Amino acid sequence: MRRIIIKNTKNIKQLTFDIPNDNGVYLLVGANGAGKTTLLTCLDRICNPYAFATNFTSANNTNNIDQYSASSIEYITEHAHIKFRKGTRRWACTPRTNSSPLLKREFGFENTIFIKADSKRIDVPQEEIRSGNLVDVESTIIESLNKIFETTKYNNLKRLRNVNGRGRNSTYFYILKDGRKYYSEKRFSTGELAIIRLVERLQTTMSNSLFLLDEAEMALHPRIQKNLLDYLNEKATEKD
C-alpha cells in the first residue's frame, strides 16, 4: 500500500489516493478546480522536499489568514506514516527526523519530475534570447518529436547555448533552422514547445522515476494527443 490522504488543501476537502502498484501511464481526469494539480504536487513531494514550499504558497490578503492552517497531507505505507501540516512559516512533518529519505524509500521512487502547466514551462523572455553557440539536438529527441507530430521539420532543430547575463549556468533554447533563418522558441506554439520540453526531460530521466505532467492535452489535436500517449507508454516500458 502506498497511500496519500489530503485534507483541506486548495479545493480538496478530503481525498484518499492509492498509488497503483504497476508501473505505466495513468491519467487523472476531473473537472477544472477538482484538485488534480494539488494531488500532483503531493505526489511530487515524495522525492522533492521543496514541492510544498514552491506550490502551496499563501495568497496575500489583508486579514493575514493562512489558507493552509487546517491542511494536512499524510503519506501511508505498511511500514511508515508521515504527516505534514502547515506551521507558521513552513510545512512541518511528523516524524521530524529523516522524514524525507523515509518517504522516498517507502514509496520506492528514485526521483520525481513535475512539469507544470505554467508560463515557466513554455515562455522565455525575449531579452533572454541572445546570440550564442548553436549545438545539435540529440537524435533521439528529434526522432521522438517527428513521430509525435507526424513531420520531419524537427530534423533541423538546434539548441542555442546561452550564458546568462551574470555569467552563471548556461541555458539552452531551442532554435528551428529553416534555410538561413532561425526561429526562436518564441515562435513555437504552446503545445509544440511544451512537448519539446517534455521529451527533453524524459530522455534524461532515470529509471523508476515518477514523472508528473499537468494538463497533458496542452491544446493539442486529438491525433497528436494519441501519439503523445503512445510515446509516454513506450518510455514507461523502457524506464521500468
Question: Model-flagged regions — what are they?
Answer:
Residues 1-4, 99-111, 152-163, 189-199, ...:
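Phosphate-binding glycine-rich loops and adjacent basic patches that engage nucleotide phosphates
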Residues 2-34, 44, 184-240:
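Switch/communication elements of ASCE P-loop NTPase nucleotide-binding domains
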Residues 37-44, 81, 135-138, 162, ...:
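Generic detector of short, locally flexible boundary/turn motifs and exposed helical patches
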Residues 43, 47, 141-153, 202, ...:
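Hydrophobic, Leu/Ile/Phe/Ala-enriched alpha-helical segments that form helix-helix packing faces
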Residues 71-76, 173-181, 228-232:
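Short, charged low-complexity intrinsically disordered segments located at boundaries
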